[in-house]
Design a protein with these regions (language model features):
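TPR alpha-solenoid repeat register
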Residues: 71, 136, 170, 214, ...
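Canonical tetratricopeptide repeat
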Residues: 74, 139, 173-174, 217, ...
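Alpha-helical segment of the N-proximal tetratricopeptide repeat
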Residues: 31-60, 64, 102-125, 129-132, ...
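Residue-level recognition of tetratricopeptide repeat
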Residues: 34, 68, 99, 133, ...
Length: 501
């Protein structure tokens, strides 16, 4: 056994001079202490959205230890086949790593399987068995947040901060419950506290003053309040501190959002163009940042302009060096974006044609990947999207058939949020048929922070004679200053309901 490689098992304990608090991380197994340093560096990049830098550090770590399980799991290659290969290699190392690492791998696998009950069970194990580690409570808080169990999530994340006041991700998630940030799960409108969000933003700046991400998040607070001038210098600081990093384009995009909602659409689109140019050699980032340029046309009620931009992106996809699987994904997404625009612009034939293209590309992608999770998601998506388009064009009986199939698929998932989409669409269908009682019942069983469906919930409340609550919902939507396809569609409609458009 003399020639067997020495395995370094790290349980990091850092003594903080200011507070004398022992900060304990979860154990990570690797044959190389240098690989571990690179892994920790990668996770710092992960925290602030620098994906290329994260993968570069993990490449170096894996060169030193090719069987570094957590590095393989966290690599997250943009190539789906390589990503699956890394995940399978990490699983094969299960008998060489600690039980805590096995639980972390199982949490992430549970997300992929749509089994949020299993994710919760494994996160609770970490807390029960590594109660001294802030990371145990962070994992639990993330899972609880994604399950929309926000009170429990807040408690867990605060317990993580008690164990490590410099936990960047803890403060970021807590802030995101109050201030919009990407796909972060938020508290209901009446429980959001912008001042508290500001405090978390200040903590993020204290913890990572070296990077532009916390300045961007603090600026979001002012944007949420409609104080666009106060947000500008913070967005500029974010751009300055992200120069040369893979997230620099993101800094320009969010600055563009601030100009758009502040009424300067010309400067906003200039910022979007700058962002897109910065990532021209990164096909996935190029595709994603182009979406915000598309959304700017929808916000301006220019669906034809949005469709033109989508078409401009679409014709370039084959030349952008995507891998085979991701190319099909992006073609399906481009078709979906067209479908949304056509459907909400009452262009029926074009909407159904775009829907058909999305379904075709998704099925081909699933066939090539031969991954059970992707196959399930594609089947679910086909029923959801078809039901949605059928509802928008008044084909309610057809939509109900799609919804029954969707319900059957989603009920198989162990996830308290699995039926949110079903209830949102069912609520729309009942509303359009004039049954506001069943509509409200479904909306109330869905995601109470889903802005698109909340617009229709407002219409249902109005139909039921509850003008006060309807107006409250329309006001919440009308003052939302963040960019996504769903907000872009219903924000102007909500203003119209309030007599502001």
């Amino acid at each position: 056994m003399r020639n067997a490689p020495k395995v370094f098992l790290l349980v990091t304990i850092i003594l903080l001079n200011c507070s004398k608090t022992n900060v304990v991380k979860l154990p990570i197994t690797t044959t190389s202490p240098s690989a571990l340093e690179l892994y920790n560096k990668a996770m710092l990049s992960f925290d602030v959205g620098d994906g290329l830098e994260k993968r570069a550090a993990l490449d170096s770590a894996l060169a030193l230890d090719p069987n570094f399980a957590m590095a393989l799991e966290m690599y997250e290659s943009p190539d789906p086949r390589l990503r699956i290969e890394h995940q399978e290699r990490a699983k094969k190392m299960a008998d060489k790593i600690t039980e805590a690492e096995r639980k972390m791998l199982k949490i992430r696998e549970s997300y992929r399987n749509g089994d949020m009950d299993m994710a919760l069970e494994n996160a609770r194990w970490l807390v029960d068995n590594h109660n001294d580690s802030f990371e145990s409570y962070l994992w639990l808080g993330v899972v609880q947040s994604d399950r929309n169990e926000l009170d429990n999530a807040i408690t867990s994340l605060k317990q993580a901060i008690e164990r490590n006041e410099d936990c960047y991700e803890c403060n970021q998630i807590l802030m995101g419950h109050h201030i919009a940030a990407g796909s972060q799960v938020m508290l209901p409108e009446d429980r959001r506290d912008v001042d508290l969000g500001m405090q978390y933003g200040d903590e993020l700046i204290r913890i990572r003053n070296d990077h532009g991400a916390p300045f961007h998040l603090k600026a979001n607070c002012y944007r949420q309040l409609g104080e666009f001038e106060k947000a500008k210098p913070l967005y500029e600081k974010s751009i300055e501190k992200r120069k040369g990093l893979s997230s620099e384009g993101t800094a320009y995009v969010v600055s563009g959002h601030n100009y758009m909602f502040g009424g300067d659409l010309t400067t906003a689109r200039e910022r979007y163009a700058s962002a897109i140019k910065l990532v021209d050699d990164n096909p996935n980032s190029w595709f994603i940042l182009n979406l915000y340029l598309t959304y700017s046309y929808i916000f301006d009620n220019d669906y034809i302009g949005a469709i033109d931009n989508i078409s401009s992106v679409e014709i370039q996809l084959d030349e952008r060096n995507f891998d085979e699987i991701t190319l099909l994904l992006r073609k399906g997404q481009a078709s979906w974006h067209k479908m949304i625009c056509y459907a909400h612009n009452q262009m029926e034939d074009e909407a159904y044609s775009a829907l058909g293209q999305r379904i075709k590309f998704n099925k081909k992608r699933a066939e090539l990947l031969k991954d059970a999770n992707v196959t399930r998601e594609v089947k679910s998506d086909e029923q959801f999207q078809t039901a949605w388009v059928n509802i928008l064009f008044g084909k309610y009986e057809d939509a109900k058939k799609n919804l029954e199939k969707l319900k059957k698929i989603q009920k198989q998932r162990n996830d308290p949020t699995a039926m949110y989409g079903y209830h949102g669409l069912a609520g729309m269908a009942h509303l359009m048929e004039g049954n506001h009682e069943l509509a409200l019942e479904n909306f109330n069983n869905g995601n109470e922070t889903a802005i698109y469906f909340n617009y229709f919930k407002g219409l249902a409340l109005k139909a039921a004679g509850n003008d006060e609550d309807a107006k409250k919902i329309f006001n919440e939507i009308a003052k939302t200053n963040f960019s996504s396809w769903n907000i872009a569609i219903v924000r102007r409609l909500a203003k119209k309901q309030l007599g502001q458009a």
